[in-house]
Amino acid sequence: MDNKQSRTRNFSIIAHIDHGKSTLADRLIQQTGLVSERDMKSQLLDNMDLERERGITIKLQNIRLMYKAKDGNEYYLNLIDTPGHVDFNYEVSRSLAACEGALLVVDAAQGVEAQTLANVYLAIDQDLEILPIINKIDLPSARPEEVKNEIEDLIGLDSSEAPLISAKTGLNIEDVLEDIVKNVPPPKGDNEAPLKALIFDSYYDAYKGVVAYVRVFEGTVKKGMTIKMMNTNKKFEVTEVGVMAPGQTELSELSAGDVGYIAASIKDIRSCRVGDTITDSNNPTEEPLPGYKKATPMVYCGIYPGEGEKYENVRDALEKLQVNDAALEYEAETSAALGFGFRCGFLGLLHMEIMQERLEREFNLDIITTAPSVIYRVTKMDGEVVMIQNPANLPEPSEIKMIEEPIVKGDIIVPKDYVGVVMELCQERRGNMLNMEYIDERRVMLHYDLPLNEVVYDFFDALKSRTRGYGSLDYEVKGYVASTLVKLDILINKEQVDALSFIVHETRAFPRGKAMCEKLKGEIPRHQFAIPIQAAVGNKVIARETISALRKDVLAKCYGGDISRKKKLLEKQKEGKKRMRQIGSVEVPQKAFMSVLKLDE
């Protein structure tokens, strides 16, 4: 092992949302003097505006720090920042595959939360060295000793030596750096072996083509070398290699153990997939690295071009986003109400929202999105089994033998005062309680089976608001269970709007339908004729609202006069409105589609 390799440390930071990952990353960058005070800004690695506004990390980022340790040596620290949100779990697993160690940041006031556990298990799966770090010890409500015990009890990590830090004030950050140097193992790998590098992220650059972020496991990669993608067998000539420090910094080569980027004028987006292995085309390696297991989308929704937007623009934008986000899936579909568009698959509601915002911001697109739905498994009378992503494709009720819906196992951690309200919420959402356990005298972990379509809708928001932000949720899909589900259609002016249809449990059809009709009544502008808005299950209308017509006062010219004259004018107006209703079409604004997504029960 060469000297440089023994002085390299690859690590990432994992934590629950808001426990201070990005702030700690900022402090490490500042402490090592990588960025001048003038250029330093908070959430330095979160370079999307969206990430800054919401205060969350969406994309993993990597950066190389140089640190002169107390033992007199200079170390190369490659930090890979990860998101904390459950929807972005696959982003976390990707960054962990490129590391040897992980810093587990736990908030000294909040303690271990549901997604802390989920991320720790990901790190344990990858055999990483996990270093617990207690953050926010400057808070008056901090209880570092109790939290240390929690980490030991719940996760089984020895945290007696865990650094107690405050990422906000910069207290004890030096301890974290020393901890990394001492406890994270240096990368293994042979510089002379054939090249083997894992693509853990990529993005599209208008000048350089697709730029791949890689972790080199074996061998060396230099400018001018011909590389081969093992998955697609495509070959490219390397135009530039380097590291992020924090901008792209070109180097002569990347060798075993390094984390950096490779540009090779790759114009075709599909030939540089995240999780693929790069090797030397003249001296290829035998086996590719074990890539990532494909992220399976949980939530589907339709994305359609809005007013005056071109279908091709939406397609190109989705293609570019897919390079950067391997979990996004899409296929073309058509809707009677909205024309040509795409059915897109996402990992969860937050993922879906973020993608929509990125399409609107980064590509300046005007898009319409339909209500999210999950994949149902339908067994027909003739024994055929079909998977339904789009409610509009659900077969006729007479053809259906049974419908099954996906069930998730949810782990919810809440303070014990809120156990009652959380149980109530889970019951409302058709949850089935498995068991509950006390983590310590203050907090409880509840295990529930919940239908996924209740979780994707707005469960997360409801949980946060009912527990005043203290509840945390982690879930994984368990399987399919038969259920009595019906398709709820919305008819506007007696015409079905397929984009508003969705599948719902029988018991929830009436309240859901009624709420949707009321919401749409407020959003659709009045027309010259009355518009009925109906919610129907099959042929049976279960709720209705009417938007009254705008009408001209036809009696304005009749001062006094005979009643029959007035009647004649009113009848004439009525006839006109009736004719209008038969031929008139109703404009449904995008706002109406969006408002239906945010129904508060």
From Swiss-Prot:
The keyword Nucleotide-binding applies. It is a peripheral membrane protein. It holds the Pfam family GTP_EFTU_D2. GO terms for biological process: positive regulation of translation. It is found in: Cell membrane. Belongs to the TRAFAC class translation factor GTPase superfamily. Classic translation factor GTPase family. LepA subfamily. This is Elongation factor 4. It comes from Clostridioides difficile (strain 630). The lineage of its organism: Bacteria, Bacillati, Bacillota, Clostridia, Peptostreptococcales.
